A protein has these predicted regions:
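ATP-dependent carboxylate activation and anion-phosphoryl transfer catalytic cores
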Residues: 1-216
Length: 216
């Protein structure tokens, strides 16, 4: 029998890391992905509204030790469960890839994670701003929130829905990033995830980012 500690009202916190082949590890702050359905993330934001400087130093040090001990290189995500009652973090896993929600980290750091993943694979050394390399939270540029847009049928319990996109109007404007591979006339097939787009709202504060990410 295996017994695990129960965490009530948990929050899903993950740290974006970049590690090169020369021993350097950059922890590019955290994302919060607590809003989920059926254990699937729906809304992600950076940085987490519950993160403190003390918590961040603990997470950053833990992630750096883990990545170096594993000899990991490239882009990755270290995931934790946060217990708000004990203010403690429980390690979940390392995702050895870029996450769907990586754009919110790009927005608040100005770092192109896709580009750096390739450059690291080519043997380049990380050359980010010192504040980013050191995990200094003064380097965080505003706040970003990502909402996943999915092809699902609300009349059938939000089951994935297939078919052709008859209409498509991508949101535009300052503070908005819209990532997708779909457009009018494209087919949503049964062979892939129901995710068809990501809407990212960015602002100087969380209050500024929220209405951009949730606009109708």
């Amino acid at each position: 029998m295996m017994v695990e500690r129960l965490i009530t009202q948990p929050r899903h916190i993950e740290v974006q890391v970049l590690a090169d082949q020369h021993g350097q590890v950059a922890c590019l702050f955290e994302r919060e992905c607590s809003l989920q359905r059926r254990h699937q993330k729906l809304v992600e934001e950076a940085a987490s509204p519950v993160m403190t400087d003390a918590h961040w130093q603990t997470l950053r040090e833990s992630c750096t030790r883990l990545i170096r001990a594993a000899g990991y290189t490239g882009a990755g995500t270290v995931e934790f469960m946060y217990d708000p009652h004990t203010e403690s973090f429980a390690f979940l896993e390392v995702n050895a890839r870029l996450q769907v929600e990586h754009p919110v980290t790009e927005m608040i750091t100005g770092v192109d994670l896709v580009q750096w993943q390739i450059r690291i694979a080519q043997g380049e050394a990380l050359a980010l701003a010192p504040a980013l390399m050191n995990g200094d939270r003064t380097a965080i540029l505003g706040h970003a929130i990502e909402c996943r847009i999915v092809a699902e049928d609300p009349s059938k319990g939000f089951m994935p829905s297939i078919g052709y996109l008859r209409g498509w109007a991508a949101p535009m404007g300052p503070g908005i990033r819209f990532d997708t591979g779909f457009g009018p006339g494209r087919e949503v097939t049964r062979y892939y995830d129901s995710l068809i787009a990501k809407l990212i709202g960015y602002g100087a504060t969380r209050d500024e980012a929220e209405p951009l990410a949730t606009r109708p």
